[in-house]
Each structure stands twice: as C-alpha cells, then as structure tokens.
Regions:
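A short, polar/acidic, helix/strand-boundary loop motif
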Residues: 32-49
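Structural detector for hydrophobic anchor residues on beta-strands
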Residues: 9-11, 24, 37, 51
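Short amphipathic alpha-helical face segments that pack within enzyme cores
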Residues: 48, 52-56
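Acidic, metal-ligating active-site segments
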Residues: 21-30
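A short acidic-Thr-Gly-centered motif at the start of a beta-strand
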Residues: 1-4
C-alpha cells in the first residue's frame, strides 16, 4: 500500500454579525507545496464558517492522508478531541440538551483521513492562522457591498 501523505492544514472562519455574511479560508501544506483556498456565504454563522474551512480543505485531498489541522476554533477542535461527534451519533445526532446538532452534514464529511486536531490562539503570533483570518475577512469585504 502507498504510504499516506502527511498534510498540515490551517483554517479560519469569520462572520460579520452572527448570523450574517461569512468567509472561510484554509492553507494546505504537503510535500513542500502550499495551497490557499477561501470562500464566502451570504448568510451563515461563525461556527459554520470554522467548520466549512476545515471541510473544504479536506475536500482538496484526493486520497486519505495523515492530516494535522490547526484551528483557533475551540468549537471545532473540541468536537473532535472531546468525542462530541461520537456522543452525538449515540444520541441520534442530538446534543446534550436533546436538540438536533447544527451542521450535521458538515460534521459527517471528515471520516476518511487520519486526523490530528490542534488548537492555536487566534489573532496571536501564528503567521498561517493570521493569513487565514485575513483571507476569510477579505471574502466578506469582497462580497458584501
């Protein structure tokens, strides 16, 4: 079997109002190559943009990889590192309060990769996180009159 490629991904999401217009961005790095992607949604939430950034980045990968994903979103990182998803599945996609889990379809899309989720401080000294933040905010600026 072919060895899985090691990929590092940085992501960020931004929202002007919550809900409101939002942007997401990601930087993917593998085998010495960097790729930047970003996008816009006219009516969304900050959590949805954080999650969309991660999943759009994962969609760029053409085969299963060893992924280390860095995000400043406690919501995103905790969902994976604290077994929220497994608990939601056991409760038929209901959260601890018995309400349907938001963004279920997005959560279910990340299964094929070996994932490591890492929390970084937002708006701090990480140049990749700061670049993603700028890209996500620019998506809003470019798409909202």
């Amino acid at each position: 079997p072919i060895a899985k490629t090691d990929v590092v991904i940085y992501t960020d999401g931004a929202c002007s109002g919550n809900p409101g217009p939002g942007g997401w961005a990601a930087i993917l790095m593998a085998m010495g190559v960097e790729k930047e992607i970003s996008g816009f949604e006219p009516d969304t939430t900050n959590n949805r943009m954080e999650l969309t950034a991660a999943l759009e980045a994962l969609k760029e990968l053409k085969r299963p990889c060893n992924v280390t994903l860095y995000s400043d979103s406690a919501y995103l990182v905790s969902a994976f590192n604290e077994n929220w998803i497994q608990n939601w599945q056991k409760r038929n996609w209901k959260n601890a309060a018995g309400m349907p889990v938001s963004n279920r379809a997005l959560w279910e899309e990340q299964k094929q990769h070996k994932m490591t989720w890492r929390k970084v401080r937002g708006h701090a000294d990480n140049p990749y996180n700061n670049r993603c933040d700028k890209m996500a905010v620019n998506e809003i600026k470019e798409n909202v009159p």
